[in-house]
């Protein structure tokens, strides 16, 4: 059973890195009728932002995989699995949008994935309450990060905006689930370290 679980997660990890993700929900579409044409500069900026979002979802897959594998609670395994499936939708949506913008995912995805997997293992080894607290804090920071992207996206890019808005709604739900399941608030130094690491990732992934 454990071996089967490892094989499943290994397959998911490879698909996350390779950009071949399964989509259980369709790509969110804007309410507006026809999207406006983006200028070259707007397309480039939107692509940079969506590449950052795609990297965030690669990291989310690794984090949830590690946390799922390190908990002994069947209920938490299911919670992490459910969140990972929704995050896999985000991964597919952002990859789809990058293709529409004639761009590509980050070249450093294997590095981002490996780093996030290691962090997830450490969080999981610290116990379920700490692991859930880490999940809740991660989702809070992602929510803030997506709020920033919603204000930065070109006004005409309603397609990217629709995707980011649905992603944000899902992240809020995941964070609440972690808190409701018993997640504790992380110490301030840990939260600051997470923000610093996130800043390095986002500033790099925008270009690479």
Swiss-Prot record:
Q: Give binding positions for Fe cation 1.
A: 57, 87, 90, 171
Q: Where in the cell is it found?
A: Cell membrane
Q: What class of enzyme is it?
A: oxidoreductase
Q: Which residues form the signal peptide?
A: none
Q: Which key words tag this protein in UniProt?
A: Cell membrane, Iron, Membrane, Metal-binding, Monooxygenase, Oxidoreductase, Ubiquinone biosynthesis
List the pathway annotation.
Cofactor biosynthesis; ubiquinone biosynthesis
Q: How does it sit in the membrane?
A: Peripheral membrane protein
Q: Would you say which domain of life the source belongs to?
A: Bacteria
> Keyword Transport on this protein?
no
Q: List the cofactors.
A: Fe cation
Q: Name the residues that bind Fe cation 2.
A: 87, 139, 171, 174
Chief location bin: membrane
**GO terms under biological process:** ubiquinone biosynthetic process
Respond yes or no to whether keyword Magnesium is given for this record: no
Cofactor info, note text: Binds 2 iron ions per subunit.
EC annotation?
1.14.99.60
The function of this protein is: Catalyzes the hydroxylation of 2-nonaprenyl-3-methyl-6-methoxy-1,4-benzoquinol during ubiquinone biosynthesis.
Q: Which NCBIfam families match?
A: DMQ_monoox_COQ7
- Annotated family: Belongs to the COQ7 family.
**PANTHER family under this entry?**
5-DEMETHOXYUBIQUINONE HYDROXYLASE, MITOCHONDRIAL, COENZYME Q10 BIOSYNTHESIS PROTEIN 7
What is the protein name given in its UniProt record?
3-demethoxyubiquinol 3-hydroxylase
Q: Which organism is it from?
A: Burkholderia pseudomallei (strain K96243)
């Amino acid at each position: 059973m454990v071996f089967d679980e490892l094989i499943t997660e290994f397959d998911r990890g490879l698909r996350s890195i390779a950009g071949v993700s399964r989509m259980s929900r369709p790509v969110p579409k804007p309410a507006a009728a026809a999207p406006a044409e983006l200028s070259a500069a707007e397309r480039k900026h939107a692509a940079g932002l969506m590449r950052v979002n795609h990297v965030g979802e690669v990291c989310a897959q690794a984090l949830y995989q590690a946390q799922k594998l390190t908990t002994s609670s069947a209920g938490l395994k299911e919670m992490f699995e459910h969140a990972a499936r929704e995050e896999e939708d985000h991964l597919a949506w952002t990859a789809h949008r990058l293709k529409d913008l004639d761009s590509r995912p980050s070249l450093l995805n294997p590095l981002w994935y490996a780093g996030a997997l290691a962090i997830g293992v450490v969080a999981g080894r610290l116990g379920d309450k700490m692991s859930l607290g880490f999940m809740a804090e991660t989702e809070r920071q992602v929510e803030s990060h997506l709020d920033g992207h919603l204000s930065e996206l070109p006004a005409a890019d309603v397609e990217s905006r629709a995707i980011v808005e649905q992603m944000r709604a899902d992240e809020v739900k995941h964070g609440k689930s972690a808190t409701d399941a018993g997640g504790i608030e992380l110490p301030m130094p840990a939260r600051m370290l997470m923000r610093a690491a996130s800043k390095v990732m986002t500033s790099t992934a925008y270009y690479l």
